Amino acid sequence: RAGRLRFNCDFDKAAGIYNTITDSYTEEAEGYWGLILCKYGIEYADNASGKKVPVCHRISYDSVMDDEDFELVMENSDSESRAIFREEAKIIEENRKKYIQIAESEQPYDIYISYRAKDDNGDKTAVSEIAGHLYNKLTSARYRVFLSEAALKGKKQSDCEPYIYSALNSANVMLALGTSYDDYNNVWVKNEWNRYLEIAEKNKNKCLIPCYKDVDEYDIPKEFAGLKVCQLGNDDTFNNIMAEIADVVKQESVNQPAPE
């Protein structure tokens, strides 16, 4: 089950199962390796020659080679398996370093808009229209805003992580938009707000603001409990969001877009 979840890029749920495995079977190298793959968001995809290669969806400043779980992989592997794990880890580590370089070259953002752009049929979602409207309003107010449709336009999914990572770490506010249970529980959207909550836990200057309409209390992620929310779809929506943002992002520190 953990492998299936990881295959579907549901890394948090997969990691929970791998943790259960390693708690019960402390000498199971595959369990620790699974935790590594989840931590760095590794998906195996075909390259141009058809070979399966690791694609990273969660970069970190922490080296793979120095990770405690990787050390446990090494301790609990035979010599043949150890060599295979080390080669895979080196590839992931090289990708991590490359992605960090790209991320550090990016301009910082003030606001990250998290939303589900397309539904399971590939059609544009209702919440994507709201996201686009907010993006236009906020950029007009001179905020630098990360919106995936704009920031990642023309990029392959396998190349997006450095830009997402940079935006998640630099933005002082995340607006988590939703009009349904599926909007918040889409794997990629959940990946965004989960990671941002982890960052905000370490940096109290960062703030996640759930913004929703037509979502009942049972469909709101439990992780949002205690957070100040904004209701979408009424006349005061934008003013309320702007007021919340202004409390977090001081105007003098706004990362204004460079002039054309």
Label for each model-derived stretch:
Residues 188-215:
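Membrane-associated lipid acylation/remodeling enzymes share a hydrophobic transmembrane-juxtamembrane segment
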Residues 38-104:
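Alpha-helical linker/edge segments of TPR/alpha-solenoid repeat scaffolds
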Residues 90-177, 197-207, 236-260:
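Conserved N-terminal substructure of TIR/SEFIR domains
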Residues 15, 22-23, 39, 74:
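A conserved position within tetratricopeptide repeats
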Residues 1-20:
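Alpha-helical segment of the N-proximal tetratricopeptide repeat
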